[in-house]
Amino acid sequence: KMLEGNHANSKKYNIVCVNCGCNANRLYQEYNKSVIRIEHCDYCGQVVDKYVEFDPVIIFLDALLLKKQALRHILFNSGIQSCWKFTLVLLICETITKLLQKSHVPSSGLHTSKVNWQEPDHVIYSAMEWDLFKYFILSLIELGCFLFGMTVWLLLWKCFVRKDTDLPSATVLLQGLVLSSFGQVFMLPMMLWGLQEHSNVCRILCQIFTFSANVQTTRVLCPVWSFGVSLISVLFGHTLSQMTIQQLSQ
């Protein structure tokens, strides 16, 4: 089924070699329903996309390791048309995480909040509070400012640095950056598994992983950018996002 889906998508989307990033005509040649031949890249000579035969779990694990091959498969060869559902899940997880962290913040200098935010009744009650909607809006603004900063960087590069550079469209770049922010989802299960005492450490680790995934995704989508340019672009986007949130929180 995975092969059939990728074969159908290869007619509609640009296929790239997961090893060198060069364009390819197709992922494989199908002779009949039971006989196929995996295509090799004309530039590097390797298999165009080895992940068409892999289990999704293996692809996910390689994506966790931030391997360029896995990221190219997901971003180019998997035929993802829209990531709005994942964006919504990402925002909801970030909203609940902020709400749980707020519920566990010390209420005074000597005592911590006695609200048991892990109780179902409290979760349902919190859903009707203004804080839930406030944190959702803040999470949306935070993500939007980051994507806006990356878009500005991309447009400035196209206009003033190298106008003839083959860079992706803003839509493709933003979709890839949203997908590469999946590390933020890990914060929620950490909180629910009773790691709220180390929430700050867990959040820092998730932010480091997300930042690294954003940089690696930028390098995959914009191969003409050096590591330094990709690093600065992602840093610019996150800095703009954090500065905006700090101003709104004052």
Label for each model-derived stretch:
Residues K1-I74:
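N-terminal cysteine/histidine-rich coordination modules
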Residues K11, V35, L61, A127, ...:
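Intrinsic disorder
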Residues C17-C20, C41, I92, G149, ...:
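Generic structural hydrophobic/aromatic packing signal, biased to beta-strands
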Residues V18-N19, R26-L27, Y31-R37, I137, ...:
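Preference for well-ordered, secondary-structure-rich cores of eukaryotic proteins
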Residues E39-C44, D121-Y125, V185-M190:
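Short hydrophobic/aromatic-rich motifs at helix boundaries and adjacent loops
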Residues G45, V52-A170, L174:
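Selected alpha-helical membrane-embedding segments in polytopic membrane proteins
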Residues T151-Q250:
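Hydrophobic alpha-helical transmembrane segments and adjacent short intramembrane/lumenal linkers
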